[in-house]
C-alpha cells in the first residue's frame, strides 16, 4: 500500500497548524512536524507524527546524526526514519547502507533537483529489503512520478504543499494509487428460487456509492456476484447510497488486498472493497453491520461450464448488475439473464487466495 505524509509549512506555528488541519481534513495519515509543536499537533486530531523527538510516533534523524537515537527509539516501540538530502553519490551510498540496518523503518529522500534524484538506483539496491522508501516532493505531479518509478515506485511520498487544494489532490492520488482493479465477466442465470428465511447482512458504509457500484459477494470463492448498492430510486423506500444488502451470514465478500471475509465477521471500522461495473475499486469503511432474519432467494448462474451460486434477500430493492452495467432487481431475474461476476481460479484459506483443489457446491 502506498502512503503519503505532509511536511508542515509556514513561517509561524499558526500557519504550520493550518497545514496539519489540511492534512487531517484530507485523510492524510502522517505529518512531518517541528519537535516543539508535537503537542499542538496532537490537540488537533489523531495523525501519525514524524519528528526528531522521542515523543513522535516516527522518530526522525538527519544524515550524520547519532544512529543510537533510533536504536533507543526502536526499543521503546517507536518507528524510526532517516532523512537524507541527496546531493552527491556519497549521499546515495549512505542512504542505501543505512536502509539495511534492522532498526531503521523508513528512509526519507530529498533531492535538491527532483529530476536527478537517483531513486532508481536506491530502489534497485534495496529490492527485497524491509525498508520503506519515502520521497520528498513539492508537487502532486512529482508525487505520482515517484509512486510509479521503475514500476515498483517508492512506498511513500512527503509532499511540501503550496495550498489546501494540493493537499486534497494528493489525497485523491494516494487513493487512486492504492485502488485495485478486478476482472469482471458475465455469467448466465440458470436458476432462481426462494429458499426460506435466514440471517441476512446489510453493510452500511461511511461512503456514498454511485450507480454501477456495489460489492462482490458470493457463496463460492471461485465466482462472486457484483451486488449493487441501494442507489436506485423506487416508489417504496428511500435510497440508501451508503448501503449494500449483501446476503446471508455465510457468504464471502471481497476485501482490500484480494482477501475475503465472511459477512458474519464484518464490523464497524473494517474496510471493504467497493467495485464498479468496470472492475475499478476503492476502499470504504464500514459504519454499521445489520444482521436480520429475512426471506432469501437462491441465484444460480453458469460461467465457463461451472455453476456459481449466491443467496440474496428476496426483495425488489436488492439488485445484481446486468448487461451494459445496469442494475437488475432479483425479482426481475430470469433464466438467461446475464449478470456480472468476478471469476477466480483460487481457493480460499482464512481469506487468502491459495492454489488448492476445493469442492464447493
Curated annotation (Swiss-Prot):
The enzyme's E.C. designation: 1.4.1.24
Catalytic activity as recorded in UniProt: 2-amino-2,3,7-trideoxy-D-lyxo-hept-6-ulosonate + NAD(+) + H2O = 3-dehydroquinate + NH4(+) + NADH + H(+)
GO biological process: amino acid biosynthetic process; aromatic amino acid family biosynthetic process
One Pfam family matching this protein: DHQS
UniProt keyword annotations, A-Z: Amino-acid biosynthesis, Aromatic amino acid biosynthesis, NAD, Oxidoreductase
Example of a GO MF term: 3-dehydroquinate synthase activity
Record-stated family: Belongs to the archaeal-type DHQ synthase family.
Function field: Catalyzes the oxidative deamination and cyclization of 2-amino-3,7-dideoxy-D-threo-hept-6-ulosonic acid (ADH) to yield 3-dehydroquinate (DHQ), which is fed into the canonical shikimic pathway of aromatic amino acid biosynthesis.
PANTHER family xref list: 3-DEHYDROQUINATE SYNTHASE, PTHR33563
Designated name of the protein: 3-dehydroquinate synthase
Organism: Methanococcus maripaludis (strain C6 / ATCC BAA-1332)
Amino acid at each position: 500500500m502506498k502512503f503519503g505524509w505532509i511536511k508542515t509549512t509556514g513561517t509561524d506555528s499558526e500557519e504550520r497548524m493550518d497545514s496539519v488541519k489540511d492534512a487531517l481534513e484530507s485523510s492524510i495519515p502522517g505529518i512531518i512536524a517541528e519537535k516543539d509543536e508535537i503537542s499542538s499537533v496532537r490537540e488537533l486530531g489523531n495523525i501519525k507524527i514524524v519528528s526528531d523527538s522521542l515523543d513522535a510516533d516516527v522518530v526522525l534523524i538527519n544524515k550524520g546524526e547519532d544512529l543510537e537515537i533510533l536504536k533507543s527509539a526502536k526499543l521503546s516501540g517507536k518507528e524510526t526514519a532517516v532523512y537524507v538530502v541527496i546531493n552527491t553519490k556519497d549521499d546515495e551510498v549512505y542512504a542505501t547502507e543505512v536502509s539495511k540496518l534492522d532498526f531503521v523503518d523508513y528512509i526519507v529522500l530529498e533531492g535538491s533537483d527532483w529530476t536527478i534524484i537517483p531513486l532508481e538506483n536506491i530502489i534497485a539496491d534495496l529490492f527485497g529489503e524491509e525498508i520503506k522508501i519515502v520521497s520528498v516532493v513539492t508537487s502532486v505531479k512529482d508525487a505520482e512520478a515517484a509512486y510509479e518509478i521503475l514500476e515498483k515506485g517508492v512506498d511513500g511520498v512527503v509532499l511540501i504543499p503550496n495550498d489546501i487544494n494540493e493537499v486534497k489532490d494528493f489525497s485523491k492520488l494516494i487513493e487512486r494509487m492504492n485502488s485495485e482493479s478486478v476482472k469482471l465477466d458475465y455469467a448466465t442465470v440458470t436458476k432462481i428460487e426462494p429458499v426460506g428465511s435466514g440471517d441476512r447482512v446489510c453493510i452500511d458504509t461511511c461512503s456514498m456509492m454511485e450507480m454501477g457500484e456495489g460489492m462482490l459477494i458470493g457463496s463460492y470463492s471461485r465466482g462472486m456476484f457484483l451486488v449493487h448498492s441501494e442507489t436506485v430510486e423506487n416508489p417504496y423506500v428511500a435510497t440508501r447510497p451508503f448501503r449494500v444488502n449483501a446476503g446471508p451470514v455465510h457468504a464471502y465478500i471481497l476485501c482490500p488486498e484480494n482477501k475475503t471475509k465472511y459477512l458474519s465477521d464484518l464490523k464497524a471500522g473494517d474496510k471493504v472493497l467497493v467495485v464498479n461495473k468496470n472492475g475499478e475499486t476503492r476502499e470504504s469503511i464500514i459504519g454499521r453491520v445489520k444482521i436480520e432474519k429475512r426471506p432469501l432467494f437462491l441465484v444460480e448462474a453458469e460461467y465457463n461450464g461451472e455453476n456459481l451460486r449466491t443467496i440474496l434477500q428476496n426483495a425488489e430493492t436488492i439488485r445484481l448488475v446486468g448487461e451494459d452495467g445496469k442494475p437488475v432487481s432479483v425479482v426481475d431475474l430470469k433464466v438467461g439473464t446475464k449478470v456480472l461476476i468476478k471469476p477466480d481460479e483460487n481457493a480460499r484459506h482464512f481469506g487468502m487466495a491459495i492454489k488448492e483443489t476445493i469442492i464447493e457446491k
